[in-house]
Amino acid sequence: MIWYILVVGILLPQSLAHPGFFTSIGQMTDLIHTEKDLVTSLKDYIKAEEDKLEQIKKWAEKLDRLTSTATKDPEGFVGHPVNAFKLMKRLNTEWSELENLVLKDMSDGFISNLTIQRQYFPNDEDQVGAAKALLRLQDTYNLDTDTISKGDLPGVKHKSFLTVEDCFELGKVAYTEADYYHTELWMEQALRQLDEGEVSTVDKVSVLDYLSYAVYQQGDLDKALLLTKKLLELDPEHQRANGNLKYFEYIMAKEKDANKSSSDDQSDQKTTLKKKGAAVDYLPERQKYEMLCRGEGIKMTPRRQKKLFCRYHDGNRNPKFILAPAKQEDEWDKPRIIRFHDIISDAEIEVVKDLAKPRLRRATISNPITGDLETVHYRISKSAWLSGYENPVVSRINMRIQDLTGLDVSTAEELQVANYGVGGQYEPHFDFARKDEPDAFKELGTGNRIATWLFYMSDVLAGGATVFPEVGASVWPKKGTAVFWYNLFASGEGDYSTRHAACPVLVGNKWVSNKWLHERGQEFRRPCTLSELE
């Protein structure tokens, strides 16, 4: 039994240690306070060590003066009975005390605090996740490595630089993922900073080793050979580089012979070798998505823009909004996307965030085949669910959604609160279940998701837009506003133009909350039409 308790005591902290910090900026802020506490503890340790050294220094200076005098006339010195007594006392007692002082470990307090805090530290998954986020932001927002390394990002308050070690680490993360495109970019950045004279524990040989292989994997044999020769100039005995040099020369000689025999083979070979650039899975939708995230989307024609209006909305003469109607703005026409301004107060936002923070967990998606909830690489955020009955503010927010949309919220899902992490995003997806996903919301028994209501609970310094790649719409976060759209036509058929995504957060902290309203209860609130696509 005692052994069982010990094992649980040892293992339990480890289970709590890795909440996936990189998926939530909100939770990452806790790490700042943790590190500040450790710095304070470290300074206390340094002060204790300095006090200890000061005592030893004073002792040494006193003995230096004493022994200098004694060695000039040893017999005369010890001939004095007091000096003889004090010599015996020093060597028998005081030197032992000094020994204890020297051996005294002043680090106990710091080590104890560090051990306690370490169980809440990020792990390898967090570090790799944050690195991948930087690579994702680099692609989405067309940032070059030098811009990121110098910290020249839009809207930043706290500029931060990447060292050679940082660039090298990013390159290694990409290398581990077989992402040789980003490996090359970041190893070249590391090499550039070394050439500029930056002092680093990473040497050029290590950088060139990764760089030459990454270039080779992308089909540029000439450059790979050149980099390998450069490496061997620095380290002629490098075994892998010597092996690679022979292999690259062999491949190039073989290609040269093949090119002589067939011009067709030559053109085929060029096609095969030149693969540098975007990843294989870089689909046209991805390109549209990234363009929209950068604000380079399709511009609506003036004729269509004239049909978009701002208005005061009273919720179809709802008593709550007759005297103080909501401010409504058309963001897009098809699908119709409406933004409500000043629809949630700062005080309400703080209550919702405070309720959600302790419950934040890595956001999941429903597997279209199994129906199971699972985490995925393309959704980087943490979420929590809030019920209306647990707090009057949540209940009031739910009723506000019902009053303004005219839809019944009693069959809606709970309010989902999400906080996005480093480069936090949710790639293109549908909110509704398609015909090949009949079991997606079966357990709820409330039909499909008829509409989406999305609150923006923070401003975002850069990035973080909600985009609709099918139609070219971009909706930018603005604290205190909300956007609303129907996922289904009145017929119950899914509106595929509502496929949308949350762009990566480039700079800042993004908080949102959303309400998914379902079909049940809307039969008379939004009756079916005769047309399938209306």
UniProtKB/Swiss-Prot annotation:
It catalyses: L-prolyl-[collagen] + 2-oxoglutarate + O2 = trans-4-hydroxy-L-prolyl-[collagen] + succinate + CO2. Its EC number is 1.14.11.2. The keyword Isomerase does not apply. Keywords: Dioxygenase, Endoplasmic reticulum, Glycoprotein, Iron, Metal-binding, Oxidoreductase, Signal, TPR repeat, Vitamin C. SUPFAM superfamilies: TPR-like. One of its GO terms (biological process) is collagen fibril organization. This is Prolyl 4-hydroxylase subunit alpha-1. It comes from Bos taurus (Bovine).
